[in-house]
Amino acid sequence: MPIHSSVLELIGQTPIVKAQRLDTGVCELYLKLESANPGGSIKDRIGLSMIEAAEKRGDLKPGATLVEGTAGNTGLGLALVAQQKGYKLILVVPDKMSREKIFNLKAMGAEVRLTRSDVAKGHPEYYQDLAKTIAEQTPGAYFINQFGNPDNPAAHEFGTGPEILEQMGGDLDAIVFGCGSSGTMTGLSRACLLYTSDAADE
């Protein structure tokens, strides 16, 4: 087994296992274990994708501050990547987030700012809107903006999707996934569409 120079090299290429003790009827059910990512979820993929794409474009300079609003695991993925790459990270999270998750974010080096969870998008204290404001008011800051960032679905279009298709040998009828920012849905849909188009051409 190889020795890796960075934990970021462990993101992706997660295993697939066949469900054995579940009643799946006439179907065969396979589970892709995204919990095997170093940060514990599929969000490691988009954290790496969004930060590295910004680096390649020149949007991120050494020592920059990253800012994002998150109510879920994206914060953990970003904290993992930011810590490894030496960026300061400010995360704006709703006050309903679990204490355990907040402790984890802080332990990984993120600055956590709590905001109200009882307001909707468009309100200045809504976590996404507040994160954008903080980014605009912080010199040298870069707003990740997972909900409008094309590098979010790209992580799945060029990463997760091709992995699944390769591991399954293209033999699958449906994919079931959770949906938040819609990055997983968009990226996997594009990957599957490209695969079926290529298969039809053959």
Residue ranges and their predicted role:
Residues M1-S197:
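PLP-dependent amino-acid enzyme catalytic core
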